[in-house]
Amino acid sequence: MKPVFLDFEQPIAELTNKIDELRFVQDESAVDISDEIHRLQKKSNDLTKSIFSKLTPAQISQVSRHPQRPYTLDYIDALFTDFEELHGDRHFADDHAIVGGLARFNGQSVVVVGHQKGRDTKEKIRRNFGMPRPEGYRKALRLMKTAEKFGLPVMTFIDTPGAYPGIGAEERGQSEAIGKNLYELTRLRVPVLCTVIGEGGSGGALAVAVGDYVNMLQYSTYSVISPEGCASILWKTAEKAADAAQALGITADRLQKLDLVDTVIKEPLGGAHRDFGQTMKNVKAVLEKQLHEAQSIPLADLLSRRFDRIMAYGKFS
């Protein structure tokens, strides 16, 4: 797949194009230009390191939405075996913006749930751009309660702009569905591990992100509102999105300092989409460690700690 470059990555894109052109020449002629290709590759890596070492919150927000970033089903394919997807909320419909089911993680049975976006136009529409309706959250809760019934740990992957704000969703109880998930997750009698892999948009993210451990990928975001939405409310223009991103504190490092996130998972150079394999290794290592820790903690302590965590959200000094 041809890499997609964001606006601030254009210098990297230009070098990449030059490297591709030289590789084409190398293949078509007897002239050895491998040294020049290696020189440009090193220059590209150095430039990428330089750019990504000083990303602004607004730029990190762009990376978190990158169209080639791994989505929940990519993590399920890479980290789990024997995945059996389960469908429907048993009340209204099956929401394709939420995927989940039974799987094995290192041979251990678990329940995995996450938001799912689409790659092409047809799939984006089917997945509603990763914005769940109430039936999506009710499906997620049904799967989590199934996990509780059979004593299976729950792993969730968060990547959504937010809960879908359509009239139908509101009529079917969007806020009730989110609130019910928050309530039930604080009481779920199995370990719950949550990982923000892209966008963590408001209550739409939090509805599957109440857990014993909350992780964020290095270039993911987590916020009560998108920078554009915040700018539109406060400044009446989305052009102030960069200022809003700075003020909101949406980045993983910032949220870890506020004790809202346990672990910031390092991403490969250039972001998770540049190296799926390394990203999966990094995520798996963290989840393995946390699952072992969570299963060694007495259930009463686990539930108490989880409840205290969510009740501390919004407190600051």
Curated annotation (Swiss-Prot):
* Subcellular location, record wording: Cytoplasm
List, for all copies, the residue spans of the domain called CoA carboxyltransferase C-terminal: 39-293
Q: Which Pfam families does this entry report, sorted A to Z?
A: ACCA (PF03255)
Give me the Gene Ontology terms describing cellular component. acetyl-CoA carboxylase complex
> For this UniProt entry, what is the primary localization, expressed as one broad class?
cytoplasm
Keyword Lipoprotein present in the record's keywords: the answer is no
Write out the catalysed reaction. N(6)-carboxybiotinyl-L-lysyl-[protein] + acetyl-CoA = N(6)-biotinyl-L-lysyl-[protein] + malonyl-CoA
The family database entries (PROSITE patterns) matched by this protein are listed as: COA_CT_CTER
Top class in the EC scheme: transferase
Q: What's a single GO MF annotation on this record?
A: carboxyl- or carbamoyltransferase activity
- Which keywords does UniProt give here? ATP-binding, Cytoplasm, Fatty acid biosynthesis, Fatty acid metabolism, Lipid biosynthesis, Lipid metabolism, Nucleotide-binding, Transferase
User: Which BP terms in the Gene Ontology apply to this protein?
Assistant: fatty acid biosynthetic process; malonyl-CoA biosynthetic process
Q: Which residues form a coiled coil?
A: none
The EC code for this enzyme is 2.1.3.15
| Biochemical pathway | Lipid metabolism; malonyl-CoA biosynthesis; malonyl-CoA from acetyl-CoA: step 1/1
Which InterPro entries is this protein grouped with? Acetyl_CoA_COase_a_su, ClpP/crotonase-like_dom_sf, COA_CT_C
The record's annotation in HAMAP family points to: AcetylCoA_CT_alpha
Q: What family name appears in the similarity comment?
A: Belongs to the AccA family.
Q: Could you tell me what this protein does?
A: Component of the acetyl coenzyme A carboxylase (ACC) complex. First, biotin carboxylase catalyzes the carboxylation of biotin on its carrier protein (BCCP) and then the CO(2) group is transferred by the carboxyltransferase to acetyl-CoA to form malonyl-CoA.
Summary of subunit composition and partner proteins: Acetyl-CoA carboxylase is a heterohexamer composed of biotin carboxyl carrier protein (AccB), biotin carboxylase (AccC) and two subunits each of ACCase subunit alpha (AccA) and ACCase subunit beta (AccD).
Protein name stated in the entry = Acetyl-coenzyme A carboxylase carboxyl transferase subunit alpha
